[in-house]
Each structure stands twice: as C-alpha cells, then as structure tokens.
C-alpha cells in the first residue's frame, strides 16, 4: 500500500491506503460528516460539518479534499478521544502548549502537569480549560468553526492544569482541577471553577487593592448570591471568581474562608491561641497540607503532637484547648470531666481539638467574619 515514496495508486484524489483508515474510522464509530449518500446509498445521521470542515484535512471520514496523510485528522482524533479517552502514554510529561493565533488549536494530553500559554498572542484571548468548550482570540466574538485560525479547544479526556493569558485583557476559565491561572497584563476576568485555584500576579500585595463584590446569578429559576473579587493595581482591574488563592510577588492571600483557609486559622487558634492563628508561615504550612489532601483530623493530630508531644497527658490537652478557647485557666471540674473522657477512650484529643476549633467562640476570637472580607495572608 505504501512504498515510502507516496507514489502509490490513487483514484479521485484518494490513496488506496486512506480507504483502510476511513473504514477503520467507521469500525471505531465515526460517521460521514456530510448529508449526501455514500456509494452504498447510506446517509449519515446529522449533525453534519460545514463545507469548510468537510475536508480530509480535518477528517478522514470526508470524501472531499486530497488525502495526503495516513493518520486520523484533528476532528477524527477529537471524536475518538470523546468515545474512548486519551492515550495516557502520549504527551504524558509536563507539557506546555503554546497558543497559535494563526491556526486552530486542538489540545490533547495524556498526563503530567500541563500549561496552555497564550502570552505571545497579539490579541486578547478567551480560553477555557474544561474539555469541549470553544475558545477564541478576542473577547466577544468567536468564529463559527472551531477549525478557524486562533480558535482553541481542549479535547474530551484531557486535563490541563495551568493557563497563561496574553498581555491584554483576557477571559480565562479553569476546570475542576487545582488550576494556576496567570492573567499577565490587562484587566482580566478569571474564573477558577471547582478545585483549589490560584491566580498569580506580577506585583506586590502592598500595591494591590482587594475589593469583594456581590453578584447575583440566576440558576434553575432561583437567584443565587455569588461573591467575587476585584484586584486593583495601577490602571488595571482584574475580576476573579471561584478563586481560593492569590499569589503576589511578596506574599499570598487565601480567600476560601469557608474552606481550607478557614479551617487552618481555626486549627491554629485552638492549638496556639488567637494571636498565633494569623502566623503567616504556619498558615502556609497548613494550607499546603490540606490542599495536598491531608485530612483536617490528621492535621489536628499532627499539630497537637507538635505542641504537646506524642501521647500527651489528658489534663494538659484539656488545659491547652480551654485556655486557647476561653483565655483563662480551665476550672478543675472541666479538666476532670474531659480528661476522664479522654482516658476512658470515649473522646480523643483530636476530637476535642476539632470541637474547639469549630466552636463559635473560636470564630469570634479570630474575627472569622472579618476575614471573609479581607482574606488571609500567608507565606
């Protein structure tokens, strides 16, 4: 079928070897992209591709265009990955995919921690990390065809972690992973989606103003209140949604007060007292642990061992948590009651620590309500 020279028999611009690729495509579940009957008289069910995409350069299932390659075309690959997933051994390292505004961009990847980089774009970009979305150059208008220049999509089955925007005002949207999103210059609109997401800035925290805003969103006939943030620096204002971490040049800010950030400061208050709950280094260590998958219970246990050592005396445990909660020495009756529960195995020191961390008094001690408005700095 192929002697390596490409000088092989053809008919109607079809190399005979392409017939096998075409028929293998059918066997794998691909259909014709056009409405006209095949030579056997069969008509593919809709939807169909536009004429500009009904070409062999985009799909081997087309009858149009000269077929010069012995491999599936971009739309074939996207459809097959939707059906069967991505080959995990291909592009399995930490790969950087550079956005090309002169060509279409079909992103597919087998593994690793990967990045889409649009920093060299001469125009703003609108890019989504979730598979199947239609990204494009510009902010408000996309080409009708995903195969047009500057269009970008992540194929189904591919997970991309990081995204770098252009030097203009971009719209960047993450996926369900823990994303790192870099808007670069301009006034960007950034939405992290699910996961613990980080936005990186190229200026110091002291040079930025953080303003929380309330937005109203309609969903299933109901109106939801959504919190967003504006990060103002110089003449640029970034609007961010569903972002848990802000990384400045000199420090970081955690915004998820109802998530891991809130858990850490409550844990530190229970273990070390309210004054130490804002220790930036301790907060950073705790966030790294929880964001990496460590449970709150395991972190509380580790923290208690750090403060009191392994297998601490039950009375010392009660005294520690009571004083950090109330601010005074525990009464003997309290010490007796809870130390006996610990000694009898009916209450663990970790359980007591969690109860103290989640107590309303702890929330008041660390001004948890106020932290919702400012975020929590850490290093």
Regions picked out by a protein language model, each given a short descriptive name:
Residues 1, 53-58, 75, 158, ...:
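Short, solvent-exposed loop/turn segments at the edges of secondary structure
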Residues 1-13, 64-200, 205-209, 225-232, ...:
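Glycine- and aspartate-rich repeat motifs characteristic of hemolysin/RTX-like Ca2+-binding segments
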Residues 4-6, 10, 14-20, 339-343, ...:
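A well-ordered secondary-structure block
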Residues 5-11, 34-39, 43, 67-70, ...:
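Short, polar/flexible loop-turn hinges at active-site or ligand-entry regions and domain interfaces
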Residues 14-75:
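The catalytic-center signature of Zn2+-dependent metalloproteases
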Residues 210-218:
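Short, composition-biased motifs enriched in small/polar/acidic residues
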Residues 244-379:
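Substrate/cofactor-recognition hotspot
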């Amino acid at each position: 079928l192929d002697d390596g020279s490409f000088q092989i028999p053809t008919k109607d611009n079809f190399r005979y070897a392409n017939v096998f690729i075409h028929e293998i495509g059918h066997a794998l579940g691909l259909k014709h992209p056009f409405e006209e009957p095949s030579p056997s008289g069969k008509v593919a069910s809709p939807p169909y591709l536009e004429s500009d995409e009904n070409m062999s350069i985009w799909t081997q299932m087309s009858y149009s265009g000269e077929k010069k390659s012995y491999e599936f075309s971009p739309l074939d690959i996207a459809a097959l990955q939707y059906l069967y997933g991505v080959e995990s051994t291909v592009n399995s390292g930490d790969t950087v995919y550079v956005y090309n505004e002169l060509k279409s961009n079909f992103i597919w990847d087998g593994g690793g921690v990967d990045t889409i980089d649009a920093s060299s774009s001469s125009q703003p970009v609108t890019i989504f990390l979730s598979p199947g979305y239609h990204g494009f150059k510009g902010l408000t208008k996309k080409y009708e065809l995903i195969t047009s220049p500057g269009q970008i999509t992540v194929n189904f089955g591919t997970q991309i972690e990081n995204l770098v925007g252009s030097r203009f005002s971009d719209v960047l949207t993450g996926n369900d992973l823990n994303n790192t999103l870099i808007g670069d210059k301009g006034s960007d609109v950034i939405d992290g989606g699910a996961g613990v997401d980080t936005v990186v800035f190229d200026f110091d925290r002291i040079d930025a103003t953080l303003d929380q805003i309330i937005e109203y969103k309609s969903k299933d006939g109901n109106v939801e209140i959504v919190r967003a943030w504006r990060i103002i620096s110089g003449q640029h204002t970034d609007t961010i949604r569903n972002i848990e971490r802000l990384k400045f040049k000199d420090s970081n800010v955690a915004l998820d007060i109802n998530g891991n950030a809130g858990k850490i400061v409550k844990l530190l208050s229970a273990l070390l007292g309210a004054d130490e709950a804002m220790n930036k280094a301790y907060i950073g260590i705790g966030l790294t642990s929880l964001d990496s998958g460590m449970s709150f219970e395991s972190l509380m246990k580790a923290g208690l061992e750090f403060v009191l050592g392994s297998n601490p005396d039950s009375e010392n445990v009660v005294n520690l948590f009571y004083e950090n909660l109330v601010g005074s020495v525990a009464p003997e009756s309290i010490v007796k009651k809870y130390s006996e529960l610990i000694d009898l195995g009916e209450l663990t020191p970790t359980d007591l620590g969690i109860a103290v961390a989640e107590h309303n008094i702890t929330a008041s001690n660390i001004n948890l309500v106020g932290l919702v408005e400012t975020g929590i700095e850490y290093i």
